């Protein structure tokens, strides 16, 4: 028997297997996915590899094939299902097998496990008394003191013995040699769930919530494992639906994974789950120490926990019997990996569930176009919650035209309506959230007099300003010189739109000096528990106003917040991205959902230069269907996902001329060798930021209805690029439907 083994090293260009012979004694035990020790290279140094294929045919002369040394012991290994998942990632997202394996195995480097040592008495009371008498006669004070303590308490922590009883390691060793006691060790798992106290009263479900739970549970009990899109308006109680269905799955001896979009959600989310399921819950996030992450991996693997909460990486928790995967706020961009492999957690979750026989719940007040499109086409099941749980109603929304504010002479960041409502809420001792809809480095260019945004005439996305003043489209490469006069109204108030949270904070303190202000952005949340500290302060009423970027509108529930101010809705609306309208609608709807979630009524003020835009109007009305109908028509017209599939090929190099030639070669290869009906290949164009740290980047887009066609193209390209000397100093990456 022969095994195809992939080496446990990370190198983008290394994506091939090595064939090894399987020793007779391992033929009956070796399995796909096992970690094995192998001799490698001319010096036969021992390294670790993974079995990714088994067969009886030798690919090389038999005398040249080396033997596997043995199965790796004592390390976290890639089990068969993880390797199958890695192969699926490779095929669907254009990465190497090594990169896929390192993604699906959460912890690769074994961290030294913390251990707790205790001294245990292993003789009966009569024997202990005899030894005690002997020690008294011999004046062996330390031994007498230790045995006396063990008679009273048969198990004592070793640290107490050394610190409180002043007993040395030699005395403990002597007790072991004499057969009086033994030292036992147990792994100490670091518990990342902190500050969870008290009990939470179980909430009575309303009729819509009950129907949602009953639907999912009935299908589950019948073995009909589906993917559900739980479309619930903000405050409709989606989390209670998650809790009920998870409890049902756990009662059947299976496990659940709950994905959250980013670390800021853990403060409230973990408490709600921990109150229901106790220490069976754990969390995983990027700010945890390596040791903490390793502990959670082991706890899941050994069955000590049943619910894992975390961002997209928590999806790869090694549960043995996964029954349910919940993706809360499924529309969030954070579920898409920005590093290779550029997978989407939603797609991977559905694949894992299909393989494991599990259900998936995708929850959102503003579903992604992909999920809603799938529901409309019958690929997943739609469940709707269209009313708020409890007594909270939807907030009143004002759309303020900033062009009119400018005409009235108001050049501050606060419209008259927002300033008026802020004064009112501060007087009532109610809380306010101010949201700065900020994205990216390069801003869009617009006219402050009439609101016109400079767009690409070919792609219907905003042009991005470069350092030299040129405006460029990063989808097709269209370029135009710097614009100083508005082509629509002739005004010279044409500029890039940029703002910052610090500037907003300064303006708030100047306008409302008596207000207690907190700012939540990347600068103020550095450190392990930065998010939780700020959210806790605000939740406890220690601030009147919370200012922040996207992280403040992601699912937080603050009952005393009755006013949400969106300072500049246009900042995301005109980013150079075909998803700009969708992201704006989602952010504005989520922002509006933060106000008036309890008994108090809420207000939302949306400030914008384009008050008539359909995404802003739909968000103000909380009308998802109206938004979807207009947006899907635009996607179909332009051939963007989910109507079509879009693959972005990214090339980068320190050699600009080499990069230009390489990008031209890729474009020509696709045009000449990938003759699929309906295929479009656009580019190459410069990347949004063409040069970073002396590395130049170009982009090529490939569109087609069939996802498998794009998979086939990136595999064909890989075959021709890997080992090609012309691409030795060019990095090529793929991003599908990013």
Give residue spans per PLM region.
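A general secondary-structure signal for short beta-strands and their flanking turns/coil
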Residues: 2, 15, 44, 429, ...
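Solvent-exposed, membrane-proximal periplasmic/extracellular interface segments of envelope transport
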Residues: 59-72, 685-687, 692-707
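Accessory, non-ATPase domains that flank or precede helicase/AAA+ motor cores in DNA-metabolism machines
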Residues: 1-364, 376-392, 676, 708-715, ...
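Inter-lobe coupling/hinge segments of SF2-like helicase ATPases
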Residues: 199-206, 210, 214, 223-660, ...
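Extracytoplasmic/periplasmic
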Residues: 657-670
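A general secondary-structure junction signal
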Residues: 53-55, 105, 185-187, 436-438, ...
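A carboxyl-terminal module marker
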Residues: 668, 672-693, 732
